[in-house]
């Protein structure tokens, strides 16, 4: 039994909410959602009630043991975390616990791994850029990317998430039901949904949809010095001081 937690910031972006709905319907292994930060706006609080109406448990930190139980009736530890926000809660958890897999929307793979002729126009010639989720808590990102308590890290970064295919008009056209009752603008890039989709495929938890839409390469993340939310992140084929990760480099 694989226990899955999703970390979301539902005050900031509707993408996280759409992703939770997708996971609730696709993954019978979803243990619950950690909200970081807990919503303070009226819209965010209403979204919490909506999430609970889908039968999803809401936590304020990654639970050590919880449902679902294994065939022996024993609650198992969290094994997989999908992160659509800051890495704060992950950094706290892996101080004393192990994870089999962390999948997140974050990081960047640019030059020279992704050459300019294959990069999105906005990223051509760039080897490092600011990336929102890492920069929400750079100290946590730094700690997580060095942690020996995470077996595998998979990064789905802005070099693929910003592609025009990553919308309800293209690859998500069969999932438009996710928008029912929710304000989603045309052409909205679905960063977190793409990362979670790929993570579920890696572990065979995605029901009838089991084909990757992204291609990956083993890389080492790097930054040009920790500078808070101005930190620029990239990827290297050579060791950088961070652990080796599997990062999306392009589309199938």
Residue positions per predicted region:
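N-terminal acidic, glycine/proline-rich low-complexity segments
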Residues: 1-252
